[in-house]
Amino acid sequence: MSRRTVAKKRPVAPDPVYQSRLVSLLVSHLLKKGKKSIAYNIFYAAMKNIAETTSQDPLEVLRQAVLNITPKVEVKSRRVGGATLQVPLEVKADRGTALALRWLLIAARNRSGRNMVSKLSAEIIDASNNTGAAIRRREETHRMAEANKAFAHFRF
C-alpha cells in the first residue's frame, strides 16, 4: 500500500449566480473537454427552464432532486475464499452527493430530447418528484444492498 499521506480535499468555490457549492459540483461534472463556460450556460438555462415550469425556486428543486437521488447504501465487491461477494456498505455524505450528481447527468444525457438544457431540466424536475431514471438507479442500488444484506459482516 502507498505510504503517502491522504490527499486533502480541495475546497469547492461556490458558483457566481446562486453562491452554491452544489451548483459548482454539478457544473464540474457537466463540463466536457474543459469548457466550463458552456457548462454554466447549459446549467443556468436549465435552471431558468425549471423556474418557468414549476414556478418554484430552482435551487430548492435541485437540492430536493439531489437529496432524492442520493443513495444511503451501496454494494462493493470483496473476494472471500474463492467467491466474489457483493458487500453492502453505507455511503458517506460526500460520496453520496457525487454519485447523485453523476447519476443525474447520466440519466439526463440518456434521455430523449432536443438539447441538454431541456433534458437536464426535465430530469431534475422528475428527480425532485421521485420519478425518473436517476431515482430508478438509486432504488436498484438499494435493492442490491438489501439482497446482499447477509454479507454485511464482511466489512472493509
UniProtKB/Swiss-Prot annotation:
One of its GO terms (molecular function) is rRNA binding. It holds the Pfam family Ribosomal_S7. It is found in: Plastid, Chloroplast. Keywords: Chloroplast, Plastid, Ribonucleoprotein, Ribosomal protein, RNA-binding, rRNA-binding. One of its GO terms (cellular component) is chloroplast. One of its GO terms (biological process) is translation. Its main location: plastid. InterPro entries: Ribosomal_uS7, Ribosomal_uS7_bac/org-type, Ribosomal_uS7_CS, Ribosomal_uS7_dom, Ribosomal_uS7_dom_sf. Belongs to the universal ribosomal protein uS7 family. One of the primary rRNA binding proteins, it binds directly to 16S rRNA where it nucleates assembly of the head domain of the 30S subunit. Part of the 30S ribosomal subunit. This is Small ribosomal subunit protein uS7c. The lineage of its organism: Eukaryota, Viridiplantae, Chlorophyta, Mamiellophyceae, Mamiellales.
